[in-house]
Amino acid sequence: MKKLQKQRRSDFLLLIVAAIILIGAILVSLAMQNGMNTAGEKNVSMWLTTPDPANRLTQQAPIPWRIDDSNEAAASADTLTVEIRPNIRYQTMEGFGAAVSGSSAYLMNHGMSANQRDQLLNDLFTAGGIQLSYIRHTIGASDYSVDEQGQPSSYTYDDVATGKDYELNHFSIAKDRDVIDVLKQILRRNQDLRIMGTPWTAPPWMKYGEQIYNGWYLDYTDPRVYQAYADYFVRYIQAFANEGVPIQAISIQNEPEFTTSKYPSMSMGAVEQAKFIKQYLGPALSRNDLSTHIIAFDHNWDTGSEYAKTVLGDEQARSYTHGTAFHCYQGEPTAMTDVHDAFPDKPVYMTECSGGAWSPGFGDDLSWDMSKLIIGAPRNWSQNVLFWNIALDPSGGPTNGGCTNCRGVVTIDPLSGAVTKNVEYYAIGHASKFVRPGAVRIDSTHYSGSIETVAYRNPDGTLVLIAANTGENTKTFKVRQGNQVFKSTLPSKSAATFQWEPTTS
């Protein structure tokens, strides 16, 4: 009898132990599902894009943190280690996005059904999509502007048949109705959206030669023209505000060192731009209590450093100028660091870059976009990253005399309204979906031509690491914060975003 009681007691204890083990396993499993590892630390969330279509900003299994074992570290000395140093801080980010050109707005408003447009805007601007947070648009016509029938159209906000209009009596934003409508739809999804406006040209009657094309500069023989152009910017900002579209920033001239006879353009040298800012535009914004930022240059990396230094080197112009903008088509992003180092209190911005049919393929495109723009621009102090057209049709249009093989962030088929998300969508999404406006760039180890990185601390405290393997072979690497590490492997020409709560060590 006693033996039977002992046996039952032993069996009961075994059942209790088994139950405890089972409960512990369940708790561990639940913790893992909820982003916790067995040490009580949050796991790392990961999203991956590769040349394989199966991975397009696709969430991966959570990655656990581990204590960094010195013996293991010595044994794997050949493994790249990315150090995250949250206490070393750089610039504050304003956002990531693209441009709503006239062509983009036309396709969204006239090439899709209302349901298709809603889905696209949700994919672009809400938390369920990639949460773009910064938009550039053209003040008047550009190389991507069309009329109500989708035909090429060149115009400004103050066109007159003959003579001058110094009082801007013919000022009207009516021809940008599609753009305004799309911006309103975006703002309903993201009220914190930042919007930047850029003209391709002044009204022809203000220009020497009075042509919308050919890049003729402002008529310097008539001082009234400079004042009228400053007032033109004021009227534009006020008119868009009256439509419920606030303008946070303006650049003075798109690509001021490039002119063409194919679409609206205008030359503006650095000395002339400084003069216009300090004598006319800056005072005009101030008189009208407008806080819109003035951004200088807005052209390529290769010549931007000297142009920006000329404008910012003028003390009066500098007092009105918020920062400098750059494009990607020539030069290297290090030009932005050059300007930052010369004027560290003046932000730099990456405001235009277009993909296109000239590119070799998805993997190479992704690798370049990540290296030069998504990672390279912020590592060189840019406070935003913007692609060019947010949407184009399958032929790279509709165009107004510009590039015939450029590509939008998405492609809209106007015959069906179907949307194709291009490599630019996934590249910008690796940042915009996770790095919120107000995030601060923090220090991270960077291996050029291999595992390239940029890291941030969001306003809510979460940490984000964006990494790209720009090399030709698969790479395994460790990420270390304090005495904790996690390990990851990236195929060649791939990108990943990692997000986690700060570690407690």
Which ranges hold each PLM region?
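Short, low-complexity, Lys/Arg-enriched N-terminal segments of secretory-pathway carbohydrate enzymes
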Residues: 1-3
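N-terminal Sec-pathway targeting helices
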Residues: 5-18
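Intrinsically disordered, low-complexity segments
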Residues: 8, 27, 492-493
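Hydrophobic alpha-helical membrane-insertion segments, chiefly the h-region
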Residues: 21-31
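Acidic, histidine-bearing metal-coordination/catalytic regions of metal-dependent phosphoesterases
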Residues: 32, 36-40
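Substrate-binding and catalytic surfaces of secreted/luminal carbohydrate-active proteins
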Residues: 40-69, 73-82, 195-197, 231-249, ...
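N-terminal catalytic cores of secreted or lumenal carbohydrate-active enzymes
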Residues: 56-247, 279
